[in-house]
Amino acid sequence: MAACYNAYSAGSQSFEFDEDDDDASFDSGYEKSFETEAQLSSRRRLDFGTPPTPAIPQPYSGGTWDAVPLSSPPAGFVGLLDTSSNHSTRSGRTLVEHLNSRATNGVFDPPLTSTPVKSPEDPNAPRPKRKYAVGKNRVTRSRSPTQVVKIKRFRRMKANDRERNRMHNLNDALEKLRVTLPSLPEETKLTKIEILRFAHNYIFALEQVLESGGSINLDLEKLQNFTLSGERITKELFDALFVNPQPYPLFGRMFPYGQGMAPLAQHQTAPASHAEQPPAMGGFQHGMDYPQQPPGFDFTGSMRFYHQQQQQPHQPHHLQPNPQQESSPQQFSQEKYDLFRGSFDAAANLHSTNLDSGIHQQSSFYSQTPPWKDYPEDQAHVHPVPHQHSYKNFAPQV
C-alpha cells in the first residue's frame, strides 16, 4: 500500500494500489521523465538497491538509425538515464543542468535531417511581384451602411482639401507672375488666362529683342494691348508690330499703325535705313496734315448730289475735272474740293417737295411699268367663274 500526502487538504487521504500492477511506481515520477521511446520494454518496477548495468557502447557507423537494434538506445544516450539516484539527492538541480552534466562531449550531427534548410537567395535574381486581387476577384470586408457613408464622407473631405490646396498654390504662383510682369497702367487687372498670355508674349518679345542685339524699341503698352485682344504673338506679328509697323486703312485713308487719327508731322525725319521704311500704300500721301476726324459717309447727301447731277447734265467748263489733275494722285485738287463743296451746299438748300417729285422719274420703274388702275372694292372679292371644261362637277356629299 502506498500513501500519498496532500498538503492542501485538511486531513491525510490514503489510496490503495495493487502491488502486482506494473504501472505503479514508488518514486515521485521524476525518474519516469528520463525514459525515452527507445526503451520499448514493458514497464518495470524501479529497484534502487541493485547497481545499474553498464551499457556496452556501440560505435556509430555513420548510417541511419535503422542499423542499431531497437532493444538498446544509441551510444552515449544511456548516461542520461539515472537510476541510482532518487529525487531527494537532485532536488536542487534543474533538468537542463542534469542533462548537460550527463551528456557526452560528442556532437550530434546526422547527415540527414527532416528540418528544411533555406537555400541562399541570389541577390541579382528579380524578386517576384506580389499578386493582389483586383477587380471582381477582390474580396473586401462587409461594411455596414453607416461605415460606408463615413468612409465616403472622409474621402470627399480629403479630396476637397487637396483641391483647395492646389488652387491656393496656383493662385499664389499667378499672383507672383502678375507682379513680375510690367503693367501699363499699374492698376490694370488681368485675368488668369490674360496673365499667362501676357507672360508668353512678353518672354517672346524679349527673346526677339535679344536676337536683334537690342536695336528694337519694345513698346510694352502696345504689347499689353495686343495681349488683351486675345491673340498669341508670333514672329510675323512681332515684326509687324515693332520692326516694320504697317499702316492700316481707316475710313478710306491710310494712317500709320500706332498713331491713330493724329496728323502726320511734315517735318518727320526719315528712318536711318531704307529697309525699315514701310511700303507706301495707294491712298496714303506723305507730308499732308489729315484732319483729326475723317469725314464720314453721308448717304442722304450723296443721293441729293446724284439727283442734282441728273438734273444738270451740262456743267460749265470750269467746273469739269481736269484729267491731268486726276492722273497725279500726289497733288491736292482744289477744283474737286470746290465742286463737291458747292454741290452739297446746293443740294441742302433744295426744297423737299421739289426733291421728292422727280427724284426717280428717270428710272426704269416709271418708264416700263404700266399705269395703275383703281378697281372698286365690291368687285375685288368676286370669285371668277371657272370654265365649263376646266373642272368636273361633283355631287355634293351629305
From Swiss-Prot:
One of its GO terms (cellular component) is nucleus. GO terms for molecular function: DNA-binding transcription factor activity, RNA polymerase II-specific; E-box binding; protein dimerization activity. Residues 154-206 form the bHLH domain. Residues 361-370 have a biased composition (Polar residues). Residues 127-141 have a biased composition (Basic residues). It is found in: Nucleus. Expressed in neuronal and glial precursors during differentiation. In the peripheral nervous system, expression is exclusively in one of the neurons that innervate each larval chemosensory organ. Expressed at a late stage in the development of one type of adult chemosensory organ, the gustatory bristles of the leg, wing and proboscis. Expressed very early in the development of a second type of chemosensory receptors, the olfactory organs of the antenna. Pfam families: HLH. Its main location: nucleus. InterPro entries: bHLH_dom (IPR011598), bHLH_transcription_factors (IPR050359), HLH_DNA-bd_sf (IPR036638). It comes from the Eukaryota. GO terms for biological process: axon development; axon guidance; molting cycle, chitin-based cuticle; mushroom body development; negative regulation of axon extension involved in axon guidance; positive regulation of transcription by RNA polymerase II; pupation; sensory organ development. Residues 307-333 have a biased composition (Low complexity). PANTHER family: BASIC HELIX-LOOP-HELIX NEURAL TRANSCRIPTION FACTOR TAP (PTHR19290:SF163), BASIC HELIX-LOOP-HELIX PROTEIN NEUROGENIN-RELATED (PTHR19290). This is Basic helix-loop-helix neural transcription factor TAP. It comes from Drosophila melanogaster (Fruit fly).
